[in-house]
Amino acid sequence: MIWTRLPLYGPSKPSTGGWQPLRFDGGAFHVKGTAELARALLVLRLCAWPPLVTHGLAFQAWSQRLLGSRLSGALLRASIYGQFVAGETAEEVRNCVGQLQALGLQPLLAVPTEEEPDSTAKTSEVWYEENLSAMLRCVDLSRALVDAHGPARNSLMQLKVTALASTRLCKELSAWIQRPRGSSELSPERLAEAMDSGRNLQLSCLSTEQNQHLQASLSRLHRVAQHARAKCVRLLVDAEYTFINPALSLLVAALAVRWNSPEEGGPWVWNTYQAYLKDTHQRLEQDAEAAHKAGLAFGVKLVRGAYLDKERSMTQLQGKEDCTQPDYEATSRSYSRCLELMLRCVSNHGPPCHLMVASHNEESVRQATKRMWELGIPLDGPVCFGQLLGMCDHVSLALGQAGYMVYKSIPYGCLEEVIPYLIRRAQENRSVLQGARREQALLSQELWRRLLGRTA
C-alpha cells in the first residue's frame, strides 16, 4: 500500500440529514440570463452535429468567402467564440472572470497554442520563444485575476508542453525512454539539474541540433515554472497523445523535482492523467508512491481523456496493441478507481497532495463529493473540480453554489488563433459534445419555463 500514516482528515461526522447529493437538474440556471441560455443551447446543438465538427475549418473558410471576414467574424463572436472563449484582451478576460467569480467559479486560463501532433514541418525557435512570452503573460494575468477576486492559493493555469518543445523532440525522447536502458540517461534529476544550472545536456539518443533544442526547451519550461512560483500560480500540465506522453511525464517529473517541495507550498506543477488509457491507474499509483518517497508534493488533474478516436486510428495504422479502454463503461470504471486512489491520498497526506476532478460526468462528480464527505476532506481543501468554459454549467454552478472549488478552463486570444484551436478541441471531444444531450434538455426546459412565465 502507498499510504501508511494515519489520515490527516478524519471521517466526517454526519450532519443531521446525512450526506445530501447535489442536484444537477438545471436549477442553478436561474443565475444565467436568457440570452446566455439561448446561445448555449444553439451552440451545443451545433457542436453535436458531426459534419460541423469534422469539417469545421472548411466551414470557417467557406463562411469567410461567402460573408466576408468581418461578418463571418461577427457571427463567430456571437456564437462559438462567445460561448467558449473569454475574449481577446486582458480587459475582456477580466470581465468574463468577474462574471464567473460572482457565480462561485474560478478561472483556469489556457493559452490556445500547440504544435500539431502529426506535423512533420520543422518549427523555428522563434515560434517557441513567442509562446514562452505568451505563457509568462498568462501567469501574470492569472495572478492579477486572483488578486482581484480571491486568495492567491487558488490561482491555477494550464500549460501545453508542445507549445514550448517540439513534438518531434518529444517523440524521440519517448522512444528512447521506452528502450531497456534508455531511462538511465534520462532521469528527472538530471534534467532538473540542467534546468537549474543552464548547462548543456548531450544525450546520445539525440543529434547536436536536437540537443540544442532540448536545452532551449528545458530553459523555457524552467522560466515558466520559475515565474509561476514567484507569482504563486500553479501549473497544470496538459496530457497529449500517448506517443509523446513518456517524454511529457519525464519533463513534468523534472519540474516536480525542482518545484514541488512541500516546504515551498508545492505542488506548483501538476500532471494530467487520462483514465481512458489501460495503464493509468498503475502509473498513478507508482507516481504517487514515488513522490511520497522523494518527499515531494503531488498534484493531479484527472480526466477521462480527449484523444480516443485518434489514438485508436493511429494504433491500427501502426499495427500496435490498443492501449485504450474498450468502451465508455470501462473508462468510467478506470476513472472511478483513480478518483478513489487520489481521494485516499489526499485524506492520508493532506495539502501536499492536490487533485482536480476534471469531469463533465455527473456520477463521477457525485462520487467525488460523497467520498470527500466520508473522508472528511474540507470543501476548501486540496480537492477541486474542473469543467470547460461554456459547457456543463448545470454541474459547475451547482458545485460552486454548494461551496466547492470549481474551475472553468478558459482559452483566450484573437479569433484567428482561437477558432482552429476550438475546432481541434471539438474534434477531440466528440463524445463529450454529442453526449451533452442532458445539458441541452435542461437548457431547453429552463428557456421554456421563462417563455411561459412559470415559477422555478
Swiss-Prot record:
Family annotation (InterPro entries): FAD-linked_oxidoreductase-like, Proline_DH_dom, Proline_oxidase
Annotated disulfide bonds: none
Gene Ontology molecular functions: oxidoreductase activity, acting on the CH-NH group of donors; proline dehydrogenase activity
CC per GO annotation: mitochondrial inner membrane; mitochondrion
Record keywords: Acetylation, FAD, Flavoprotein, Oxidoreductase, Proline metabolism
GO annotation terms (biological process): proline catabolic process
EC number: 1.5.5.3, 1.5.5.2
Cofactor(s) named in the record: FAD
Sequence positions bearing N6-acetyllysine: K310, K320
Catalytic reaction annotation: trans-4-hydroxy-L-proline + a quinone = (3R,5S)-1-pyrroline-3-hydroxy-5-carboxylate + a quinol + H(+); L-proline + a quinone = (S)-1-pyrroline-5-carboxylate + a quinol + H(+)
Description of what induces expression: In liver, by TCF1 and HNF4A.
Primary enzyme class: oxidoreductase
The protein's role, per its UniProt record: Dehydrogenase that converts trans-4-L-hydroxyproline to delta-1-pyrroline-3-hydroxy-5-carboxylate (Hyp) using ubiquinone-10 as the terminal electron acceptor. Can also use proline as a substrate but with a very much lower efficiency. Does not react with other diastereomers of Hyp: trans-4-D-hydroxyproline and cis-4-L-hydroxyproline. Ubiquininone analogs such as menadione, duroquinone and ubiquinone-1 react more efficiently than oxygen as the terminal electron acceptor during catalysis.
Family: Belongs to the proline oxidase family.
Protein name per Swiss-Prot or TrEMBL: Hydroxyproline dehydrogenase
